[in-house]
Amino acid sequence: SDSLQKTLQEERSEQTRLTKERRERQLTAAKLNRELASQTMTLKRLQNDEKRLGSLVASLQRKEAEAQKAAQRRAAAAAKRSGKQTKTASVPAPQKALVSTGPRMNPVPGKVVARFGEKRTVSGKTDRWQGTVFSVTRDEGVHAVRDGKVVFADYLRGYGNLIILDHGAGYFTVYGNNATLEKDIGDKVKAGDVISRAGKNEGAVSVLYFELRHNGKPIDPTG
């Protein structure tokens, strides 16, 4: 029947589109891998850069926890002086919604060229990506994936101009390889706010590097 023929045609068109997208992603990923290999970069250096980022996030988390405790102590002392009782601020429950529900964690609309956990080959050696790499257009807006507070906005070797958001309950998001940073440390942001402009990298492929971390550990942003 005509309806069956139309359905089959639509299925073929969708399959063709998906095949084309997959092929484009493979080509971009291959180009990115070639650039990594062509730069004076070794897997060891990349891993050292990742360790530096991990140490930075852990340090930021400790500072935020200490600041929260100090604020609680000040509030308790002030309440005691005034003769009033105050409730101790509770630690927010783990934000499972940060990963499992709501809009996908895409800070930019560009195509994904490398996913969390995928193999990464540099100079003949292989390990796995700790974050997600998006293809971008230079200077396009990079958006906060959830509400949070800026706890780092500066250059970091291996990640270029980097911005890190604290979302509470041990969750942090990391946005690297930016052309410019639009927010400063201490700024509070809402989901969807432009926090930076993408596209600063050494090679011909402009990419944004994105990570989700929980209690310092990189995790899959797709859940």
Describe each region flagged by the PLM.
Residues 1-92:
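Alpha-helical oligomerization segments with coiled-coil/rod-like character
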Residues 4, 98-99, 196-197:
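A generic local structural motif
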Residues 91-96, 110:
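Long, low-complexity intrinsically disordered segments
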Residues 96-99, 141:
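Long low-complexity, Ser/Thr/Pro- and charged-rich intrinsically disordered regions
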Residues 104-223:
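Catalytic cores of peptidoglycan-degrading enzymes
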